[in-house]
């Protein structure tokens, strides 16, 4: 009625879902006719939509827009400032990002011998859920590791082994400070992991 263009962007459709839509083809075709443009993630998805009745003239493969990301310049600048203020240029910074229980414990158990042998290593721990911040802090202390907290405005000191990044909205900052990054959600069942594209966008080697 208002003649507002309707676009389906970053479209993805599995074979199973396509079969389901095909069972209600009348409804599906009516819905697809209402689209002015369909931009699919890949050729397979595009073909499934075409098979369901989408107009080829209004359709094309755009790719996944998840890859079209870049780090905010403000965080890059802040990271450069902190790197200088905290004397991180000569240190190896490993970030454990978006971690779940008991991922921090497993990873710190594996890293502890290296932290004790190599004082130039510092691990940034960024738990996924804020309600776990205090529990994670206590767990780090149980490893007898020198730990500071972002929420207390603690700096990373020469003796700091672990830095608990218990803040919100600063993930880009921690990625920008990293030499290596582990993104959590992948060690637990059912797994799957969280978004690895942000550290990769900063050219940080990511596990």
Model-derived regions: residue spans:
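Redox-cofactor binding/interface segments in oxidoreductases and associated redox assembly factors
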Residues: 40, 96, 183
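Active-site and donor-binding regions of nucleotide-sugar-utilizing enzymes
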Residues: 1-61, 65-69, 74, 100, ...
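Short active-site oxyanion
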Residues: 33-37, 93, 121-123, 161, ...
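Structural loop-to-beta junction motif characteristic of Rossmann-like glycosyltransferase folds
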Residues: 4-5, 180, 185, 198-207
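Residue-level signal for inorganic ion chemistry
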Residues: 38, 64, 107, 182, ...
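Conserved catalytic-core segment of nucleotide-activated headgroup transferases in glycan assembly
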Residues: 71-153
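Acidic donor-binding loop of glycosyltransferase active sites
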Residues: 158-191
């Amino acid at each position: 009625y208002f003649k507002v263009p309707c676009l389906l962007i970053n479209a993805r459709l599995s074979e199973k879902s396509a079969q389901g839509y095909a069972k209600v083809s009348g409804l599906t075709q009516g819905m697809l006719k209402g689209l002015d443009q369909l931009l699919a993630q890949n050729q397979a998805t595009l073909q499934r939509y075409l098979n369901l009745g989408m107009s080829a003239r209004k359709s094309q493969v755009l790719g996944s827009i998840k890859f079209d990301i870049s780090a905010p310049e403000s965080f890059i600048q802040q990271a450069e400032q902190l790197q200088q203020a905290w004397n991180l240029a000569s240190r190896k910074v490993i970030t454990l990002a978006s971690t779940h229980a008991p991922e921090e414990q497993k990873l710190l158990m594996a890293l502890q011998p290296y932290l004790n042998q190599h004082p130039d290593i510092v691990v940034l721990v960024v738990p996924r859920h804020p309600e776990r911040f205090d529990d994670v802090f206590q767990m780090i202390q149980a490893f007898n590791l020198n730990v500071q907290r972002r929420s207390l405005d603690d700096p990373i000191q020469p003796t700091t082994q672990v830095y608990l990044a218990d803040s919100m909205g600063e993930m880009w900052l921690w990625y920008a400070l990293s030499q290596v990054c582990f993104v959590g959600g992948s060690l637990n069942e059912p797994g799957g992991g969280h978004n690895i594209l942000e550290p990769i966008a900063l050219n940080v080697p990511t596990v």
